[in-house]
């Protein structure tokens, strides 16, 4: 009888242990950092300078990538940025929580047109919201848009827009 009790208890303990291992594995997979997406170059056609300006961007497509953004980045070189890609047009809202570098943000509609540009201050919890429904947001080091001659009304190149649409799928 005692042996039967021990055997039954071992089966129960084994089942509980297996369950806990599965839960731990699931949690570790969920919390694991995804590998960074490959940077890509987008082209912006500037009306004022009549040139095409390349910007090397990190795409932020998933909710986790978008939430992290440029948090805790101390340097963002000119000519680089992060493009936030959404599946549908919407009014977007950004803040600078845990972001030590001043940024400028361009809100871009589904046709690739830059609708508006704003500056954002380090660590600010103030919300920067798009006035229009847009599909993309491009963050760069503060002042870069002005230095490069990029303004509201400029457009992404057709090729850049097609590549962004493809990664949104």
Kindly give the residue locations of the regions a language model identified.
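Compact, glycine-rich, soluble single-domain proteins
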Residues: 30-169
């Amino acid at each position: 009888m005692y042996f039967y009790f021990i055997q039954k208890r071992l089966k129960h303990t084994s089942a509980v242990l297996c369950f806990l291992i599965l839960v731990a594995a699931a949690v570790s997979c969920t919390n694991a950092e995804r590998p960074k997406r490959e940077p890509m170059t987008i082209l912006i056609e500037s009306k004022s300078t009549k040139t095409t300006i390349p910007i090397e961007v990190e795409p932020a497509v998933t909710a986790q990538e978008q939430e992290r953004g440029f948090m805790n980045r101390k340097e963002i070189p000119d000519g680089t940025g992060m493009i936030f890609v959404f599946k549908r047009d919407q009014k977007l809202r950004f803040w600078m929580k845990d972001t030590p570098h001043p940024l400028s943000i361009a809100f871009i509609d589904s046709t690739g047109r830059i609708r508006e540009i704003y500056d954002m201050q380090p660590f600010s919890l103030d919300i920067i919201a798009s006035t229009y429904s847009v599909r993309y947001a491009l963050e760069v080091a503060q002042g870069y848009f002005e230095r490069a001659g990029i303004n509201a009304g400029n457009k992404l190149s057709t090729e850049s827009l097609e590549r962004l649409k493809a990664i949104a799928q």
